Amino acid sequence: MSQTAMDAAAFTEMKELMGESFNEVISMCLQSLPAQLAEIESAIKDNNVDTLFSVSHKMKSSCGSIGAFGLAKRAEAIELISREGSTDIPGQLVDDLRESTDQVVTILSAELK
């Protein structure tokens, strides 16, 4: 994987700007990211382009708001494919999305400790 999942400088900046409310955002992301990943994988398996599009779009947006630009970029790549009406997502992209999600969840979990 060539790009890191989380931009440390952007993450720190968002943390400073949001103060204590940032922990709430982190908690929401910790709940939503694994669920969104599972929904994306299920939508690909079930050939459900509508779910694939909407969930990848949500993931992209929420990741961008916390500085997880690498993960957002991978979600956007899936969003763009699904926007064209396809669920034919390259396996490497799904693997990269899964790995990036794991990285972001690890970083966010450590932040709450």
Where are the predicted features?
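Two-component system phosphorelay core
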Residues: 1-54, 58-113
